[in-house]
């Protein structure tokens, strides 16, 4: 279910303070563990280092990302492809 409009978008307080102190268009990368924070229009032009559980993934925020969560742009799982079918390998030989 979507968040109520009267509540507004959720942004962690510590992240909002970092963004306000940094200013728009800064080259400095803002390191954050807050994957749950919603991207607001003041984030446009900033680069965040979003933690994916193992390392920090750089995410440059554009206009199209507004309204999404930071965690959507830092995948936590690595897909190596589906396992090969043993029967089809034996049949080909």
Swiss-Prot record:
GO CC term, one of those recorded: small ribosomal subunit
Cited function: Protein S19 forms a complex with S13 that binds strongly to the 16S ribosomal RNA.
GO molecular function ontology, one term from the record: structural constituent of ribosome
HAMAP family: Ribosomal_uS19
Taxonomic superkingdom: Bacteria
Family under the similarity heading: Belongs to the universal ribosomal protein uS19 family.
Disulfide bridge map: none
Originating gene: rpsS
Protein name: Small ribosomal subunit protein uS19
């Amino acid at each position: 279910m979507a968040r109520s409009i009267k509540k507004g978008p959720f942004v962690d307080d510590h992240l909002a303070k970092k963004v306000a102190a940094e200013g728009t268009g800064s080259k400095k990368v803002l390191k954050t563990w807050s994957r749950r924070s919603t991207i607001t229009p003041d984030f446009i032009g900033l680069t965040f280092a979003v933690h994916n559980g193992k390392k920090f993934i750089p995410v440059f925020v554009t206009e199209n990302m507004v309204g999404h969560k930071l965690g959507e742009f830092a995948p936590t799982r690595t897909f190596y492809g589906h396992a090969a079918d043993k029967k089809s390998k034996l049949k080909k030989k």
